[in-house]
A protein has these predicted regions:
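Donor-nucleotide binding loops and adjacent catalytic segments primarily
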Residues: 38, 46, 182-255
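A short, Lys/Arg-enriched amphipathic alpha-helix followed by its capping loop at the start of a domain
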Residues: 20-29, 215-222
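A short beta-strand-loop structural module common to alpha/beta enzyme folds
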Residues: 30-39
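A nucleotide-sugar donor-handling region in carbohydrate enzymes
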Residues: 39-43, 62, 140-207
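N-terminal beta-loop-helix "entrance" segment that forms/cooperates
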Residues: 39-55
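Active-site and donor-binding regions of nucleotide-sugar-utilizing enzymes
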Residues: 5-8, 14-18, 23-25, 48, ...
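Short, glycine-rich nucleotide/cofactor-binding loops
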Residues: 4-14, 198-207
């Protein structure tokens, strides 16, 4: 029986991996799930596993939070013995987080075939850590599963052979369709704005965050604003006076 190992580490990975795991469950394929623990808070990890119907990870590497280099390096260090022992026929990685890059590098060193789900996306901004992760992961991947025609073209422009490119669509839509009926049961305002804010370039600079907080407060005077807050963002917001007290600005846990 062929063996596939899925490596995930953060919220964006979970919602992409869930439909792939379910689809492969219908085939005679052995599957293992490795969670690096890049996102480790219960509201950032466990609740997503429950809501998405993901199985308990076979391995939780408890990498935790650190700088990009340290986090990636520790994930590689902990992934290597797991993949060396498992020797799967394919490792699947998702998106562009540090865990994705770490698994890609380990697979390259161990000569294990690698597939990248959500390959080919580009911002063309190398100041973004995710862009570096995407480009390197795609260069190391044997199978590139793309969400769109522009992703295909990006890979071709970088010299990737057509035989390696497989357009499968946006797998997050599968998760959306599966969870959408449950949203209709929620009691919430009829019209509202949904906000997400977590990029370091937005939340680590007090001046930038202050302007954004002011804009959210102004927006909440026009339409109710629902804001699922990343723990790191919440800590930064606590230093910004007034944003948490706006009447129609609803700060929620990230799940």
């Amino acid at each position: 029986m062929k063996k596939v190992v899925h490596v995930v580490g953060a919220r964006p990975n979970f919602m992409k991996a869930a439909p792939v795991l379910r689809a492969l469950d219908r085939l005679p394929i052995g599957q293992s799930l490795v969670h690096t623990g890049q996102h480790y808070d219960a509201q950032m990890s466990e609740v997503f596993f429950r809501q998405l119907g993901l199985p308990e990870p076979d391995y939780n590497l408890a990498v935790g939070s650190d700088s990009h280099a340290r986090q990636t390096g520790l994930a590689m260090q902990k992934l290597e013995p797991v993949l060396a022992e498992a020797r799967p026929d394919l490792v699947l990685v998702y998106g562009d987080v540090n865990s994705t890059l770490a698994a890609s590098l380990v697979c390259a060193k161990l000569v294990i075939p690698l597939g990248h789900v959500e390959a080919g996306l580009r911002s063309f901004d190398r100041s973004m850590p995710e862009e570096v992760n995407r480009v390197v992961t795609d260069r190391l991947s044997d199978l590139l599963f793309t969400p769109s025609a522009d992703a295909d073209e990006n890979l071709r422009a970088e010299g990737v052979k057509d035989s390696c490119i497989h357009r499968v669509g946006n797998v997050m839509i599968d998760s959306l369709v599966r969870l959408l009926p449950g949203t209709e049961e929620r009691s919430i305002w009829h019209d509202y704005a949904l906000v997400t804010l977590h990029r370091p370039s937005n939340v680590d600079d007090p001046e930038v965050l202050g302007r954004l907080a002011g804009a959210l407060t102004e927006m909440s005077r026009v339409i109710p604003v629902v804001f699922p807050v990343h723990p790191r963002t919440r800590a930064r917001l606590e230093a910004v006076s007034g944003v948490c007290r706006a009447e129609n600005l609803c700060l929620l846990p990230p799940a």
